[in-house]
C-alpha cells in the first residue's frame, strides 16, 4: 500500500513538473491558432481525397456529421454551412491558391508534430524530405483511414442494432451507437501518440494516454454543449459572430485534452524509467 501511494505521489509530481515545463496551456493556444488558419484548407484536402474515391461517397455525409458533432458541438450546422461554402469557393481558386492552401495544411501537421515531440522531450530533427513525405502521407492517407474507420463503426453499429433488436428486443444497439464515437476517438488518439513522436512509444502507454484524452474530450464536449445551451448570454454579446468565439474556445479545449493525454503517455514512460532505475527524478527535473 505504501509503495502504491509512493508511486501515485511520484506520478503526479512528475506530471505536474512536465505540465509546467512543456507549457501545455500555451501549446494548446498555439495549436488553436494554427488550426483556425488551417481548418478550411485541411477540410478541403480531406474531402478532395474522398471525391477521388467513389467508395466513400456513401459515408461522406456521415463523416461530416461526425466532424461537426465532435469538433463544433451545438454550432455544427452553422460551422458546416460556412465550411461547405469555403470549400466550394476554393474550387474556383487557381493552382497557386490551391498549393497555398495545401502548404497551410502541411504547416498545421508540422505544428502538431513539433508540439507532441516536445512533450516527449525529443529534440531530434528529421531530414526535410523525410518529414515532407510523412506529412504528405498523413494528409492524403489520413482521410482514407478516418473514413474507413467511420464506415466500419457505422456498419458495426447498424449490424448490432439490427441483431439485438431482432433477437432480444433491446436497445443495446442504440447504446452501442452512442459509444462508437468515443471508441473511434480513443483509437485515433492512440494512433496519434504512437506514430507522431520520433521516440518509440509503448502501445500500452499510448492507449492509456489516449483513453484519458478521449474521456476528457467527450466529457468536455458534453459539458461545453450544456453550458452554451443553458447559458446563452454569449449570443447577446456577440450576436451573429457568436459562432467564431465558440468554435475557438472548443478548439482550445480539444487541444488541451489531446496534449494532456500525450503528456500522460510521456510521463508513464518516465515512471517506468524510474522504476527500472534507468533515470532519477533529479535528472528528469534537469531536462529542458
From Swiss-Prot:
It holds the Pfam family Virul_fac_BrkB. Its main location: membrane. Keywords: Cell inner membrane, Cell membrane, Membrane, Transmembrane, Transmembrane helix. It is a multi-pass membrane protein. The chain crosses the membrane at residues 36-56, 92-112, 127-147, 176-196, 200-220, 240-260. The keyword DNA damage does not apply. GO terms for cellular component: plasma membrane. InterPro entries: UPF0761_bac, Virul_fac_BrkB. The keyword Cytoplasm does not apply. It is found in: Cell inner membrane. NCBIfam families: PRK01637.1, yihY_not_rbn. Belongs to the UPF0761 family. This is UPF0761 membrane protein HS_0693. It comes from Histophilus somni (strain 129Pt) (Haemophilus somnus).
Amino acid at each position: 500500500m505504501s509503495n502504491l501511494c509512493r508511486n501515485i505521489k511520484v506520478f503526479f509530481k512528475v506530471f505536474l513538473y512536465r505540465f509546467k515545463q512543456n507549457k501545455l496551456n500555451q501549446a494548446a493556444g498555439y495549436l488553436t491558432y494554427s488550426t483556425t488558419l488551417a481548418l478550411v484548407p485541411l477540410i478541403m484536402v480531406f474531402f478532395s481525397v474522398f471525391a477521388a474515391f467513389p467508395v466513400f461517397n456513401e459515408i461522406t455525409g456521415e463523416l461530416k456529421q461526425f466532424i461537426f458533432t465532435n469538433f463544433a458541438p451545438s454550432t455544427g450546422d452553422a460551422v458546416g454551412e460556412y465550411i461547405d461554402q469555403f470549400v466550394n469557393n476554393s474550387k474556383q481558386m487557381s493552382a497557386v491558391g490551391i498549393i497555398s492552401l495545401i502548404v497551410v495544411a502541411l504547416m498545421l501537421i508540422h505544428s502538431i508534430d513539433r508540439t507532441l515531440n516536445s512533450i516527449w522531450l525529443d529534440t531530434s530533427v528529421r531530414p526535410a524530405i523525410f518529414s515532407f513525405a510523412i506529412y504528405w502521407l498523413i494528409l492524403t492517407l489520413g482521410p482514407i483511414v478516418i473514413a474507413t474507420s467511420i464506415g466500419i463503426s457505422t456498419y458495426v453499429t447498424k449490424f448490432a442494432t439490427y441483431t439485438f433488436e431482432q433477437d432480444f428486443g433491446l436497445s443495446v444497439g442504440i447504446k452501442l451507437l452512442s459509444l462508437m464515437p468515443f471508441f473511434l476517438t480513443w483509437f485515433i488518439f492512440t494512433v496519434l501518440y504512437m506514430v507522431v513522436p520520433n521516440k518509440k512509444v509503448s502501445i500500452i502507454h499510448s492507449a492509456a494516454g489516449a483513453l484519458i484524452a478521449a474521456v476528457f474530450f467527450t466529457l468536455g464536449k458534453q459539458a461545453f454543449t450544456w453550458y452554451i445551451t443553458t447559458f446563452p448570454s454569449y449570443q447577446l454579446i456577440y450576436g451573429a459572430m457568436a459562432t467564431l468565439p465558440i468554435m475557438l474556445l472548443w478548439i482550445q479545449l480539444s487541444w488541451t485534452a489531446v496534449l494532456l493525454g500525450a503528456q500522460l503517455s510521456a510521463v508513464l514512460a518516465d515512471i517506468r524509467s524510474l522504476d527500472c532505475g534507468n533515470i532519477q527524478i533529479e535528472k528528469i527535473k534537469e531536462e529542458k
